[in-house]
């Protein structure tokens, strides 16, 4: 990781997850997110130390492990303070709630116990709310951008807007088809809100630096509205259960839920049989080798 200058005292560490860096007058560094796991925390710390900087705080955009997994390492090794939005702080402090939510309240299967979903518990020193925030002598503006999570938050300083996962890049939209979201309503409201900002630079978590996001905001909005329109049209032609709607949406957008080979399904009579292999395998096992079978009528 190498420090990339954006403008004034604002930088970022480019990677699979871009880490924002705001530098104070005394060499203190405010980080926007911390990457995935201890390895990311270690790489961030080394990159900062190479520039004579010390991480004073991590400002998390949200709780997902690829954005907050380095928190605990930076707290333990550098004494960094952690700032987080309210709902996300619950999962940072007790990550099990995140995996429980993903698995409908049940004990999560083995595949969910990976750093992206099952990070180390992180302390949270300050709950972030929308408005001006001064951290160790450095002032930033916290902007509520819910949708990806319930309290997802972006940060602005010196005309640079750190967006976290509030926007998906063109490549992400192509890969995911339908991006993950906590609330479609919140996502649409956030996309509308983003049109009101005129910053010098915008940094997406998984994309390169941009000078303008107008077209990307519209592309994100269009994808959400296309999905909603398809669902409304589908349900206007016949009543359907949620599982039928899910299948129809996946077929319409060419999505596959079993592309990693960890979860597969087939229809037998009136039952949907889910075969979940949580032995840590490669995904190449046949159905009869799976350890767990759940039946859904």
What is the predicted function of each stretch?
Residues 11, 67, 144:
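Conserved HGGG/HGGXW glycine-rich cap/lid loop of the alpha/beta-hydrolase fold
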